[in-house]
C-alpha cells in the first residue's frame, strides 16, 4: 500500500443537520497521511501528539471536489470536511494521487512530460527485480565508496533530515542512518519500494527511515531536508536521465543543504583501436552478400554500417590507446537546473601526444562527494578498478589521421530524448590538415563488448623484446612482470590522463577502498590483477573465457544473469540503462 504524507493541513468541518450551517475547525495544522490501493484512498489526519483527529475512506463514488487553488472538500453523509493544504504544490500532489486512486488520469508531472510511457513502464519494472539491485550492490567500488563518503562525513548527517532519491533497496538510506541521520525519506518509484520497506522494518529502523513509494517529481515530503543522497549516474554519466530527477529533488532541499554526490565530471579523449573499428565493419559485411540463399542483400549494407556505428561501445580498454590528455566537462549538482541537461554541448580541443588514426572518442566519468570533513571520489576512469559503468567509446565512421603535436577540435553534443537517454552528435577536425569526420550515435542502444579478459595494449607498445626479457627473468613470467619490463612506465598517475583540477576537489582526495594494494593510482601495470576478469563478487569467474562466462556473444558483459537472457545474442540487464537492438537493458 503506497503512503504519502503532507504537513501543515488545516481541517474545517461543515454540517447542516438542524437546518443551520455549523462549522468547526482545528486550530493547529495537522499531518495528513494518505494510504492508497487500487480502489480506495484512506485519509488520516493527526495532530502533533500523533492523535488521530479525522479518518475517512475515499472511494470512486465518494462525493468530493477541489475548492480554489489549495483546498479539497469531502462529503460524508450530512457533513462535509474541507482540507486546506499548506501550498498549491502540496494540494496538486494530493489531488493527483487521489485522481489516480479513483481511476482518473492525473495531471502530468515533469517526469511524464519528458518520458515515453512505454519507456517508463519498462524502466521501473526492471528496477523492481531484486537481482538487478544485487548486481548494483555487488559493485564493490560503487557501494563501498558511497558508504565511505557518508560515514567519513558523518557530521553532515548527524541528527539531520535526509532524502534518498531512487532508493532502490534502500542501501544508501541505511548508510545515512549509520551516520546518525534523524530521519531519512527514501523515495522509490518501482515495486522495489515494498522490499525496501521490509528491510527497514527487519533492521528496526522504521522510526528513522520512511519509504515513500512514487516518483520524486510527484511525491510530497512532510519537511524540508538537510541533504540529498542518490545514485543517479548512468553510462557516460547522463544516460537514464535520472540526474534530472536528482536535480528536481532540490525543491525539498534547505537553502544551505548538501548533495551527495556534489559534482560530476565527464572526461573524453581521442583513442585509436583498429581492431574495434574493423569489428564493426565486419559485422556490417554480412549485408554485402550478393546471394544469401539466392537473395541479394547488398542494398542494405550502407544502412547496416550506419546502424552498427550508431552504437556506443560499452567495455574497458588499455589506457595506452588514448592519444591525448582528456577534456573535462563538469556539472555542479548544487547549481545545475533540470533544463541544463536537455542539451549538453561539450567543446573540445585535444593536443595530440601520439601519431596515428583517431577512431573515435572515449568517455568516462568521476563524481565527488564534497563533505564538511573530506571529499571522496568515485571514478570510472580506465586506470581505476572496474565498475559496472565500464567506459563508453563512440566511433567515427571515417577515422582521422593526426600527428603528435597536432590539435584536434570539435564538439560532442548530447540531446535528451523521451526514451530516457541521449542522441549523441560528434564532429571532429584535425586543425593542421582540415580533415573532418562526424557521427551520430544512440546512447539507448549500445553494444556491450566487455568479455572479462584483460584489455590488450595497442600494437607497437613494446620497446624491447618481450621474448628476450622473459628468459632474462629466469623463465618466470607473470603478466605484471611482462608489462613492467616492456619498456613502458611501471606506474601511471591518473592526473596524466585526466585534465583539470579544482581547488576544493582534487584527485588526491580519492580514498582507496578494499585490500588490493594496487587499488589507487598504480596505473595499468599493477592494475592488471584488479582488472582481470570483472568486478569482485559479481559471479563472473576471474579470468574466465567468454565461453565459460555465459551464452556466446560479443555482447557479453557484467554480470550475465540468466534470468534476463533472451533469445538471440547474449543479453543482460545488469548495467546502466541502455537497450540493445533486440532487448531492454537498464541499470545504474
UniProtKB/Swiss-Prot annotation:
Family that this chain belongs to: Belongs to the class I-like SAM-binding methyltransferase superfamily. Protein arginine N-methyltransferase family.
Protein name according to UniProt: Histone-arginine methyltransferase CARM1
PROSITE patterns named among the record's database cross-references: SAM_MT_PRMT
Reaction catalysis annotation: L-arginyl-[protein] + 2 S-adenosyl-L-methionine = N(omega),N(omega)-dimethyl-L-arginyl-[protein] + 2 S-adenosyl-L-homocysteine + 2 H(+)
Principal subcellular localization: nucleus
TM ranges: none
Role played: Methylates (mono- and asymmetric dimethylation) the guanidino nitrogens of arginyl residues in several proteins involved in DNA packaging, transcription regulation, pre-mRNA splicing, and mRNA stability. Recruited to promoters upon gene activation together with histone acetyltransferases from EP300/P300 and p160 families, methylates histone H3 at 'Arg-17' (H3R17me) and activates transcription via chromatin remodeling.
EC number: 2.1.1.319
GO cellular component, one term: nuclear replication fork
Gene3D superfamilies: Hnrnp arginine n-methyltransferase1, Pleckstrin-homology domain (PH domain)/Phosphotyrosine-binding domain (PTB), Vaccinia Virus protein VP39
UniProt-annotated stretches for the region Transactivation domain: 473-588
Source species, domain of life: Eukaryota
Gene Ontology biological-process annotations: chromatin remodeling; methylation; positive regulation of fat cell differentiation; regulation of DNA-templated transcription; regulation of intracellular estrogen receptor signaling pathway; regulation of skeletal muscle fiber development; replication fork reversal
Subcellular localization(s) per the UniProt record: Nucleus; Cytoplasm; Chromosome
Subunit structure: Homodimer.
Class of enzymatic activity (EC top level): transferase
Source species: Danio rerio
Database matches in InterPro entries: Arg_MeTrfase (IPR025799), Histone-Arg_MeTrfase_N (IPR020989), PH-like_dom_sf (IPR011993), PRMT_dom (IPR055135), SAM-dependent_MTases_sf (IPR029063)
CDD domains for the chain: AdoMet_MTases, PH_CARM1
Keywords attached to this entry: Chromatin regulator, Chromosome, Cytoplasm, Methyltransferase, Nucleus, S-adenosyl-L-methionine, Transcription, Transcription regulation, Transferase
Domain SAM-dependent MTase PRMT-type residue range list: 120-427
